[in-house]
Regions:
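Rhodanese-like catalytic fold shared by cysteine-dependent sulfurtransferases
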Residues: 1-4, 12-57, 61-106
Length: 106
């Protein structure tokens, strides 16, 4: 969709297997399992950059983490247009969709 921004919240080492073209990457948790506080800043920046009406689509490995975080951003932080890639990257690949190489330039 033109008014959607996709945010891949998987771990960095999972990005090495590829990412969905056009997505932004910001891991939800660090290697120790602690929440990445910069994720909130990234989502706010994307929403402000694109306009508050933008839809933020969270992408995780299997969709579960994305669903939990998407719900938190919608309910606790007041983001109106939040959704999740159902089934995550696993479902994406099951549907024979492509991934592109992750570039470590940001």
């Amino acid at each position: 969709e033109d008014n959607a921004v996709a945010l891949d919240i998987r771990l960095e080492n999972q990005w090495e297997n590829g990412v969905i073209k056009g997505t932004f990457q910001e891991t939800a948790f660090n290697k120790d399992g602690k929440f990445n506080v910069y994720l909130m800043d990234k989502v706010r920046a994307l929403a402000a950059e694109e306009s508050q009406n933008i839809e933020i689509v969270f992408i995780s490995h299997d969709g579960e983490t994305a669903a939990i975080l998407g719900n938190a951003f919608a309910e606790d932080l007041g983001f109106k247009n939040v959704s999740v890639l159902k089934g995550g990257i696993l479902q994406w690949l099951k549907e024979d969709r492509k991934l592109v190489s992750h570039k470590k330039d940001n």
